[in-house]
Swiss-Prot record:
Belongs to the peptidase S33 family. ABHD4/ABHD5 subfamily. Interacts with atgl-1. It comes from Caenorhabditis elegans. Disruption phenotype: RNAi-mediated knockdown suppresses fasting-induced oxygen consumption. This is Abhydrolase domain-containing protein lid-1.
Length: 360
């Protein structure tokens, strides 16, 4: 009896973890509602890339005014487990004279779940190759790349290999920059749930526990993270929770690649701080952190002090957590506009909104 019960439970969990056509349709619906809640008009398509004949899910918001003619565009890259709809509060503001694009990186979200190399360095280069194929297919000459968390790591890796295609890097609470240090040496203590997630990542794919919860996941995550509803309002209370659940339900090939890039508790095996100064000095970079984020801005400060004859800007948005772009979209969008419109020599000194460190 016990064996039969166990087999039934395992079968139920395996069924929960299957991404069906209905799951795909539900993901499309809740994503659409998140865009609709912010009144964002967008185009969605799948962009083919060479790597294992994959397709990169992409959304585009056209400029409100005359589009620039130099082939530049703004590109948002979401963090681990996130998707294009996380930036709905930013698209309209940023799409003034530039087309704004966002994509789910290959292996994540609504993109193909292609398998990457088990070698972390090779997997990183494969992801960079996919980004470059995507850029070519989109017909973009240069990109203002806005990467959040793991998206910031990917943006930096791309800039190392393709600096001539980067107009500016905007790295939002980027993951993977710091070298591993002892817990007692950390300047900022991470939230308990972040420490838990980092610990789990050492043994399982990061979002495996959520997949095991099956259809109960949205309700459980809502109990654990009620703040997400405030940051990412949809037309219905469960939209953001269903979105994150369905995004991470398919075969987790991207998560597996990420896990291969990490040490226990989420440190990067190849921290970007050791490599960042290899990026061409003509590529400007703006770091944006939330004052309440658990990510340490120390690596950005180190880069600022050592990256001579290059533009490095550090902004800390007061009252914001790691999702700076959602916690204070007005301040975030203003920073992005300053970068895109070339107001780099005059960073804001309005400390009621943000604290700024700047080197030029």
């Amino acid at each position: 009896m016990a064996i039969a019960t166990t087999k039934t439970a395992l079968t139920t969990i395996m069924n929960w973890m299957t991404f069906t056509d209905d799951s795909k349709e539900q993901l499309k619906i809740v994503e659409g509602r998140l865009f609709q809640s912010c009144e964002v008009s967008y185009e969605a398509k799948y962009v083919p890339v060479r790597f294992k004949r994959g397709e990169v899910y992409t959304v585009t918001v056209r400029p409100r005014e005359a589009e620039n003619l130099n082939g530049e565009a703004i590109v948002f890259i979401p963090g681990l487990g996130a998707g294009v709809a996380m930036f709905t509060a930013n698209f309209n503001s940023c799409a003034k004279n530039h087309a704004v694009h966002s994509f789910d990186p290959l292996g994540f979200g609504r993109s193909s779940r292609s398998r990457f190399s088990d070698d972390n360095a090779i997997a990183e280069l494969e992801m960079v190759e996919v980004m470059e194929d995507w850029r070519k297919a989109m017909g973009i000459e240069k990109m203002y790349i806005i990467g959040h968390a793991f998206g910031g790591y990917l943006a930096s890796a791309y800039a190392l290999e393709n600096p001539s295609r980067v107009a500016h890097l905007i790295l939002v609470d980027p993951w993977g920059f710091a070298e591993k240090v002892e817990t007692t040496e950390k300047l900022i203590k991470p939230y308990a749930w972040m420490s838990f997630l980092g610990g789990v990542a050492g043994y399982f794919n990061p979002f495996s526990p959520m997949r095991w919860m099956g259809p109960y996941a949205p309700a459980i995550v809502k109990k654990l993270r009620p703040d997400l509803l405030l940051r990412f309002p949809g037309l219905h209370d469960y939209d953001i929770y269903k979105y994150v659940y369905y995004l991470n339900l398919p075969n987790p090939t991207g998560e597996t690649a990420f896990m291969n890039m990490t040490l226990p508790v989420g440190w990067a095996k190849r921290p970007m701080i050791k490599r960042f100064n290899g990026i061409d000095k003509n590529v400007g970079v703006s770091f944006i952190y939330g004052s309440k984020s658990w990510i340490d801005p120390g690596p950005a400060i180190d880069i600022q002090s050592t990256r001579e004859n290059a533009y490095v800007d550090i902004k800390i948005v007061r009252g914001a957590g790691t999702h700076v772009y959602a916690d204070d979209p007005a301040a975030f969008n203003e920073i992005v506009s300053d970068v895109v419109e070339g107001r780099l020599s005059n960073p804001s000194n309005d400390f009621e909104i943000e604290e700024c460190c700047h080197s030029d």
